[in-house]
Amino acid sequence: MKVSVLITLAVLGVMFLLTSAEERGSDQMDSPAWLKSMEIIFQSEERECRWMFGGCTTDSDCCEHLGCRWEKPSWCAWDGTFRK
């Protein structure tokens, strides 16, 4: 839910910037710095651990008690441990 709200806000922000740039008659938008700051928000969401059957490249990509299976395509699976 949090991700969908952030995506919606990002889309609305980009639409606002596009329409305001058109109204000013400007061909150059001053939004690349703003878009790069939004990129950081989405990277923080993507850096969360991967759940069961999520794609992975190393064991550290997967959540606790999951490990990366190396079959193609790679995916997170239970590593046989239990929570204490």
Swiss-Prot record:
Keywords carried by this UniProt record: Disulfide bond, Ion channel impairing toxin, Knottin, Secreted, Signal, Toxin
UniProt GO molecular function: ion channel inhibitor activity; toxin activity
Predominant localisation class: secreted
The protein's name in its UniProt record: U2-theraphotoxin-Cg1b 2
Function comment: Probable ion channel inhibitor.
Region forming the signal peptide: 1-21
Entry comment, domain topic: The presence of a 'disulfide through disulfide knot' structurally defines this protein as a knottin.
Family of the protein in this entry: Belongs to the neurotoxin 10 (Hwtx-1) family. 06 (F4b) subfamily.
Disulfide bonds listed in the record: 49-63, 56-68, 62-76
Phylogenetic lineage: Eukaryota, Metazoa, Ecdysozoa, Arthropoda, Chelicerata
Residue numbers covered by the propeptide annotation in the UniProt entry: 22-48
Tissue: Expressed by the venom gland.
Compartment list: Secreted
Pfam families listed in its UniProt record: Toxin_12
Single GO cellular component term: extracellular region
Organism: Chilobrachys guangxiensis (Chinese earth tiger tarantula)
